[in-house]
Amino acid sequence: MGLFRRLLGGRGADNRSIKPQRLDYLNEALALERQGDYDAAITSYRLALRDHPREPRILQNLAIALSRTGNSEDAIRHYRLALEGDATLAGAHYGLAFLLIKRGDLDGAAEHLKAFLGNPPRGVDAQKWIGHAERALRDLEASGPSERSAGLEGA
């Protein structure tokens, strides 16, 4: 009779202990991003933020996905929110720096490149990102203050 009760919507002893489970939106978002479905990943990251509204790593990953879809302003906002929660997130400093360069905020970009290089990531690909950041910072410093201000006027 337990089977019939469950089929008909009755409450059997078996389903009293069953609790609804929430989806793991963060892992879903990461998988969608790996598949290249950035719009769906953004939706999943936003759903993950409902459960963990100020989680820096979710905010950082959302910012990465937003930047890949060309939504630079939202990406910048989410990188900044991530850094408010954890100022040591190297990836957030790195991503924010290059978005600020595109925007023309070269002084802000230099600040975030220095923060990234002050606490660089470790791992297999880390040297590639570190080298890229070092070159970008050298270029910014070589441009001097007058060129940096001119870059802001053109933005």
Where are the predicted features?
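Alpha-helical segment of the N-proximal tetratricopeptide repeat
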Residues: 17-54
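TPR/TPR-like (Sel1-like) alpha-helical repeat modules
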Residues: 98-125, 131-138
